[in-house]
Amino acid sequence: MTTLRIRGGRPLQGTIRVGGRKNATLPLIAATLLADGTSRLENVPQIHDVMVYRKLLTGLGARVDWDPVHGILTVHTGGVRPGEPDYHLASSIRASYYLLGVMLARYGEASVPMPGGDNIGHRPVDQHFKGLSALGAEIWMDRGIIRARARRLRGAHVYLDIISVGATIQVMLAASLAEGTTVIQNCAREPHVVAVANFINACGGKVTGAGTDTIRVRGVDRLVGATQTVIPDDIEAGTWMMAAAMTQGDVTLQNVIPTHITPIMAKLREAGVEVHELGDAVRVVGRERPKAINVKTLPYPGFPTDAQSQMTALLSLAEGTSYITETLYEDRFRFVPELVRMGAQIRVEGRTAIVKGVEQLYGAPVEATDIRAGAALVIAGLAAEGETTIYGMEHVQRGYEKLEQKLLALGADVQMERQGAAVV
């Protein structure tokens, strides 16, 4: 158990660097197994899920070198063989399911435990199975293990019934070594989908259309290791932006791609927050209480569900009543009772949170139930009067690198307390 103690009421001030995007890094690490030789990933965030993936690849026979100072992960695939990854590790993170398509495409067989990750609602993997089956894979469940095999995958037309980042990437990875051409329709368009496609192409693959709703993958016989820099984390950037606004601070974020955070910037400006784009940096100034606004989560390029919890926290201090509608995951409001403990006035009706802004939040003991809920509680604690103790910070550390270090750099009064296993 990891606990964060926050003595709130201090405006955040200063400059920090945003790390690499978690949701790009994990599929990129999996994708290195598609290629012969050595691949090098740069700007890799030092977070728990990356360390889990490193151990998963090592267990499959890869040699993985990690340079935490420079954020460089190097994967040598010469020793990789088909096998079943460690159950405890693989079932602890959702992104372990990318190993299914990768190992199936490269070795003709794969075994992966049912994925874990945050408990934010129903996130079925049926679209992954549908896509891989269309490519010719035989897939079955065996006592909590997903097993798949195919002599060689063959290109096919795959229509995804729902827009799914995971399924889009899964099919794209598997199709890269399939025989023939695969057309994937109703694709997710997130920048990390594009990042994975770019890596496949750098390795010698033939992927076009990433970033649109239709992706074409012409399979090749062999991929060779390549180097890629992980794109900045849009959700980390958005979290710090909302923290600056909520504490009425002045924070500059380096290593950002403003076009990737357009909906977050737009909503902050609508709420009266100053947002200045400075090339590959963004400055956020919160001079007064935010104004109430309405927010609806949507697939990219809409407002991201992963930033909804933090926006809800921010709007709990807004002037007026805000309506926040969550269209993607039904359990994204599980953190609301924790905010209410701090004095927020929020009522949830179905998939909409009705947030009546208050002038002040107050420190309280609260619990983080997932990555983004925990981030919301952190920024609420920073703005609250008195001391907030957040339990379950190990969830948050799955997605935010060097959190305590960055908070201290911005002038926050915080202390991380660790019990049991060390936190990476």
UniProtKB/Swiss-Prot annotation:
Annotated GO CC locations: cytoplasm
Molecular function terms from GO: UDP-N-acetylglucosamine 1-carboxyvinyltransferase activity
EC number: 2.5.1.7
InterPro entries reported in the protein's UniProt record: Enolpyruvate_Tfrase_dom (IPR001986), Enolpyruvate_Tfrase_sf (IPR036968), MurA_subfamily (IPR050068), RNA3'P_cycl/enolpyr_Trfase_a/b (IPR013792), UDP_GlcNAc_COvinyl_MurA (IPR005750)
Cell division is among the record's keywords: yes
Location of the protein in the cell: Cytoplasm
Keyword Cell wall biogenesis/degradation on entry: yes
Recorded catalytic activity of this chain's protein: phosphoenolpyruvate + UDP-N-acetyl-alpha-D-glucosamine = UDP-N-acetyl-3-O-(1-carboxyvinyl)-alpha-D-glucosamine + phosphate
Any Gene Ontology biological process: UDP-N-acetylgalactosamine biosynthetic process
Pfam family, one: EPSP_synthase
Pathway annotation: Cell wall biogenesis; peptidoglycan biosynthesis
Principal place of residence: cytoplasm
Annotated catalytic residues: 118 (proton donor)
Protein task: Cell wall formation. Adds enolpyruvyl to UDP-N-acetylglucosamine.
Name the record gives this protein: UDP-N-acetylglucosamine 1-carboxyvinyltransferase 3
Species for this entry: Symbiobacterium thermophilum (strain DSM 24528 / JCM 14929 / IAM 14863 / T)
Lineage start: Bacteria, Bacillati, Bacillota, Clostridia, Eubacteriales
